[in-house]
Amino acid sequence: MSNQHTLLSSNLLPVGSNISTWWNFGSMLLACLALQTSTGFFLAIHYTANINLAFSSVTHILRDVPYGWAMQNLHAIGASMFFICIYTHIARGLYYGLYLNKEVWLSGTVLLMLLMATAFFGYVLPWGQMSFWAATVITNLLTAIPYLGTTLTTWFWGGFSINDPTLTRFFALHFLLPFIIISLSTIHIILLHNEGSNNPLGTNPDIDKIPFHPYHSYKDILMITLMITLLFTIMSFSPNLFNDPENFTKANPLITPQHIKPEWYFLFAYGILRSIPNKLGGTLALLMSIIILTTAPFTHTSYTRPMTFRPLTQVLFWTFITTFITITWTATKPVEPPFVLISQVASTVYFFFFIINPILGWTENKIMMSTN
């Protein structure tokens, strides 16, 4: 038995001994993915993708299906938890220079785009007021594409407005995309384990490695347990914490909500979109707010990998995080002064992070060289 245990331990993936709690969010994301897939499957059994029945079918799930309320709330709150984890995961990658593992970073960026698409399609499915109008506003951005825009939008909608065919295809895509995400997540993990995890100091992890189990696996289990505890606490005491009050009303194309906005986890991108008065410019800025992450591995100029020992870049990083929160906040506000100006300034600072970061890295190199 002892020999078997030794054999098992020697085959487990060795990991750097000093990786911190920030490295636990990957496993938390896997737990979120498993939760969303399982609860989503049970919801899909009872859901009806028809504009006349969709809203009623969600009400039926909440009222009549045994534990349907738990499934629906877990799925809705789980989506928010998913994005909290993924934004933390990305911030950790930016702070500790993990983007230098190019294949992992680029596959992760593709995963983020797929996740955002999946969440958007899912938000439309209950066919509430905000679902309908958010879908109308966002899909209408396709018309900004020169020459092909109107044709693409009509093809995407399945008609000349958002209607029954749109809801049907959104449901089909919302059901299909998670399986693509699972496949890509597997590739993401394989690519990570090809090189191995980095650490907070940015030193060579081969110097001091320990088996993943039990040292890091128990840490993963602890963080997943805390996340699930928080998830169930919100579900039990404040299930509608992340819901929009407008979405408790059935979609009505004749009544426009006073302030159209998507779910909170899209507000930073929506805020950037709104800050530019031109439709095509706003659409490009919206896309670039995600795509710009792919530039990080190619613009790294510092001799040191993480920001742990780079005070100037740390100030820039926390300015970037504050900017992200500011854009999210302004996107919840109406399009009027002073929110428009705040949003425009914050959006500019958001993109400036990716321009100033390599310049600061080069400056810090010069300072280090001069002190030596």
UniProtKB/Swiss-Prot annotation:
Metal-binding keyword on record: yes
Binding site for heme b b566: H89, H188
Residue sites binding heme b b562 per the record: H75, H174
GO MF annotation list: metal ion binding; ubiquinol-cytochrome-c reductase activity
Any one cellular-component term (Gene Ontology): respiratory chain complex III
An annotated GO BP: mitochondrial electron transport, ubiquinol to cytochrome c
PROSITE patterns: CYTB_CTER (PS51003), CYTB_NTER (PS51002)
Membrane protein topology class: Multi-pass membrane protein
Signal sequence extent: none
Main location: mitochondrion
Keywords: Electron transport, Heme, Iron, Membrane, Metal-binding, Mitochondrion, Mitochondrion inner membrane, Respiratory chain, Transmembrane, Transmembrane helix, Transport, Ubiquinone
Locations listed in the record: Mitochondrion inner membrane
Segments passing through the bilayer: 25-45, 69-90, 105-125, 170-190, 218-238, 280-300, 312-332, 339-358
Coiled-coil ranges from the UniProt annotation: none
Record's keyword annotation contains Cell membrane: no
InterPro entries: Cyt_b/b6_C (IPR005798), Cyt_b/b6_C_sf (IPR036150), Cyt_b/b6_N (IPR005797), Cytb/b6-like_sf (IPR027387), Cytochrome_b (IPR030689), Cytochrome_b_C_euk/bac (IPR048260), Cytochrome_b_N_euk/bac (IPR048259), Di-haem_cyt_TM (IPR016174)
Cofactor: heme b
Cofactor stoichiometry and binding remark: Binds 2 heme b groups non-covalently.
Annotated a ubiquinone binding sites: H193
Extra remark: Heme 1 (or BL or b562) is low-potential and absorbs at about 562 nm, and heme 2 (or BH or b566) is high-potential and absorbs at about 566 nm.
Protein family (similarity comment): Belongs to the cytochrome b family.
Function: Component of the ubiquinol-cytochrome c reductase complex (complex III or cytochrome b-c1 complex) that is part of the mitochondrial respiratory chain. The b-c1 complex mediates electron transfer from ubiquinol to cytochrome c. Contributes to the generation of a proton gradient across the mitochondrial membrane that is then used for ATP synthesis.
Assembly and binders: The cytochrome bc1 complex contains 3 respiratory subunits (MT-CYB, CYC1 and UQCRFS1), 2 core proteins (UQCRC1 and UQCRC2) and probably 6 low-molecular weight proteins.
UniProt name for this protein: Cytochrome b
Organism: Aspidomorphus muelleri
Gene field: MT-CYB
